Amino acid sequence: MIANRKICVLGLGSMGMGVALSLLERQFEVIGFDINDNAMKNLESAGGVAKSSIRAAVEGCSAVIVLVVNDKQVEEVLFGKDGAVEGLSSGAVVVQSSTVPAAYAKTCGERLLKQGFE
């Protein structure tokens, strides 16, 4: 069993909300962030916790799942000012599930590994 069942979902559109709801059904604590206020309200209505910033959303989470639109958004969410890498603990698992070019996915993974993430 996973000791820390706190998982962050960044991007609460159709895919992200589906993932968040599935995690909630399996008794995970789900923290989320999205630029759309309605998506945040929907997460809270389902039993999740919405945070006002990416950094606040990832703090204390054992994993973060990124489900945004493209590589530009992934870059901002992970590596931008107050992005996920600034708030995640070393060793946290990062699952990048956005549609991005293969070269970007490889580079992104390498950067995350160098910073101590799985």
Model-flagged regions — what are they?
Residues 1-66, 92:
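NAD(P)+-binding Rossmann beta1-loop-alpha1 motif at the extreme N-terminus of oxidoreductases
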Residues 54-118:
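Rossmann-fold NAD(P) dinucleotide-binding segment
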